[in-house]
Amino acid sequence: MDQEAIYEKLTEIFHDLFDDDSIVVTPELTAKDVEGWDSLAHIRLIITIEKAFKVKFSTTEIAKLEKVGDLAALIQSRA
């Protein structure tokens, strides 16, 4: 799966999960940039992404994620 397809699907997930179609998903996007992205939303986001991309992340991998670009790279490495 290429980066464009990953970001397309991530954008859909972010819009749905945060109920905000104005979110622009970029590699530099972080939790600080999205209203409502707290620890609980983060867990829901990871679970939703795992289901959508049919992948499973370890706790260590999740803890290392700092921005959406890191997440997209992790997804691509599993695809």
Regions found by a protein language model. Give the residues of each.
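Phosphopantetheine-dependent thiolation modules in NRPS/PKS and related acyl-activating systems
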Residues: 2-36, 40-79
